Amino acid sequence: GEKSQFLLMVDNTFGTEAKFEHLAEDYEWFEQLGPLEYGGQQFAPSGEVSVLPLFHGNYDSERRLRVNGRISLYGLPIVNSGKPSFLRSDQNKIFQRLSVLNSHPVIATVTNGVIDSLEATSAEARTASEMFERLCSVDSRYRIIWEIGFGANTEMEVIKANRSPNESYGHRNGAIHWGLGLTPWTQYHIDIICPNTLIQSDGGEVLAGGHTNYHDLRRGSDKKMHRQAAIGCPCIA
C-alpha cells in the first residue's frame, strides 16, 4: 500500500470507483493485528487496520479523508451507539433497515470524504438510503467518511447480527469497511463492511478484496503512513 501514490476502491459489479489519497501526513493509522507485545492490548478477534483523518481523541469536524468518486455500500452494517442517551429499539431499527445492503446496495457519490448523494440500486435498497438520509437530516456529520477500515482476519466467520467484532472480518482476501459517524460526537458510529470492493494500487494491482490473495497493507517504502497500535478502537468512544 505504501508503494502506491493512491488507492482505488473498485466494485466491478456495480461499476463504481473511488480514489483514496492514503499517504497524507495528517491521517493516523491504527492497527489491531499482529504479535501482541508485553503490556499491549487487542480486541478479539483481532485483524483490523483503520485510518482516520485525525489523531485519536482530537475531534475536528473539518478534517477529511481524501476520498473522491463513487463507492458501493454493499454488505453488512454495524451500528455502534455512543454515550448519549438512546433506545436499543431505535438502534436496532437503524440496523435492520441498513441490513438490506447485504443484498441491495446503495451507491454513494463522495467528494473530499463527504457523501454528496445516494443512489438506491433497487426498490428494496431505498429502505437503506432513506434511513441514511433521515440520520443526515438530524446530524449532517453522518455524511462524512470518518474511517476506512480493512478487515484482515480471513479465518473468522462473520456474525450475522449487529456485532462490533465483525469489523475484523476479512472475507477471503481482506474486506474494506466504511465508517460513518464518530462517537461520542455523533450518537452512532456506523460501519458498512463491503467484501465485494477491491482495493487496488495506482498500477492496478489488487491489494485486497475479491478473490485474489490478501496482501499486507503495511509493506515498506520510502514514504511511511503515520500509524500506531491502538489500545482501544479509535472510532468508538
Residue ranges and their predicted role:
Residues G1-S103, T109-T111, G204-G209, N213-A237:
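Active-site bordering "gate/hinge" segments
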Residues V10, L73-G75, A152, L180-L182, ...:
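Pocket-edge structural micro-motifs
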Residues D26, L87-S89, A125, S164-N166, ...:
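Short, solvent-exposed amphipathic alpha-helical segments in soluble enzyme
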Residues Q42, E130-V158, Q228-A237:
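Short, solvent-exposed cationic patches
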Residues S140-T197:
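Cysteine/selenocysteine-centered motifs that mediate thiol-based redox chemistry or coordinate metal-sulfur cofactors
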